[in-house]
């Protein structure tokens, strides 16, 4: 089975040079409809799909009569104009397959600020659970030069990391990684698989080569590094053919970046090895047994909360004797955790005034010792 077909959760990134006709500034609806059919086929076999789509600035600037190079405020105005047209194009294409589309606008801060990261992840998880296809773009309308991601390759990789995706496909104007830029060097050799981003691999990166696309091979290798560390497989391939996802499955040329671990394993390694605990939760015997059986940690099983931590921080989990059982990412702040400890999940809203997660630490965010 191909890495694409094996993915339970798939991210698809489309550059603006693929989605927007260079000569007219219009969305390439015929091509988009074939991609929508591919996405529908993925969903029909049980896969979850998230799209990261460029093109808002490219579409919007034509409508506003803006001529490149654009100032930051002109790009933002173009994005505001183009985003609504882009959303309609995606909605129309997927509606033919009875698929609900959700527009999500993100900035780099949403993926690096813990609170915003958790909110964005929760929203995306909920949309996927409800059967929708989230269509994500960088929020160019409010992003500044200092906080812009700068390319949707990197944004797509951050999203893949955020939702523990199994695979990310970067559609480009080139069919994969070569030892040199094949458009300039006839002796450039194609690289079908990469297992590690060595200095030699990084030296193979080329320059951007399309009128609209701002993501060259350099940004794609940055995305690959993020994906490999997150246990997510990533492909670089040409997006121009009709039915581009099906083309990959049918053996179309692409470069696969293959990690050594799965997303869930990589995420737990990150929690265990990279995050410093900022607090401690002490459990009763029943909660300790539940965790040993692979279940989530509920507020009812907490007997003591110590430390100062915020939602999304890492905390130690101990039993009543003080033995460390594990560590995990907590869904409530220290103050809120103290307020709901020992209480049933159904009481959370009445106590805190809002309804968050039922679990204090979800099992996917928990790493047990040993």
Curated annotation (Swiss-Prot):
Quote the InterPro entries the UniProt record gives.
AceGlu_kinase-like_sf (IPR036393), Asp/Glu/Uridylate_kinase (IPR001048), G5K_ProB (IPR041739), Glu/AcGlu_kinase (IPR001057), Glu_5kinase (IPR011529), Glu_5kinase/COase_Synthase (IPR005715), Glutamate_5-kinase_CS (IPR019797), PUA (IPR002478)
GO terms for biological process?
L-proline biosynthetic process
User: Which keywords does this Swiss-Prot/TrEMBL entry list?
Assistant: Amino-acid biosynthesis, ATP-binding, Cytoplasm, Kinase, Nucleotide-binding, Proline biosynthesis, Transferase
Q: Which residues cross the membrane?
A: none
- What is the E.C. number? 2.7.2.11
Any one Gene Ontology MF annotation carried by this entry is: glutamate 5-kinase activity
Q: Where in the cell is it found?
A: Cytoplasm
The Gene Ontology CC terms held by the record are: cytosol
* Residue pairs linked by disulfide bridges in the UniProt entry: none
Q: Would the keyword Membrane turn up in this protein's UniProt record?
A: no
- Please list the residues that bind ATP: 13, 172-173, 214-220
> Which residues are involved in binding substrate?
54, 140, 152
Kindly give the PROSITE patterns that the UniProt entry links to this protein.
Answer: GLUTAMATE_5_KINASE (PS00902), PUA (PS50890)
Q: Give the reactions, separated by semicolons, that this protein catalyses.
A: L-glutamate + ATP = L-glutamyl 5-phosphate + ADP
PUA domain residues: 278-355
Query: What pathway does the UniProt record associate with this protein?
Result: Amino-acid biosynthesis; L-proline biosynthesis; L-glutamate 5-semialdehyde from L-glutamate: step 1/2
Taxonomically, which superkingdom?
Bacteria
- Protein's job: Catalyzes the transfer of a phosphate group to glutamate to form L-glutamate 5-phosphate.
UniProt family annotation:
Belongs to the glutamate 5-kinase family.
What name does this protein carry?
Answer: Glutamate 5-kinase
Species of provenance: Paramagnetospirillum magneticum (strain ATCC 700264 / AMB-1) (Magnetospirillum magneticum)
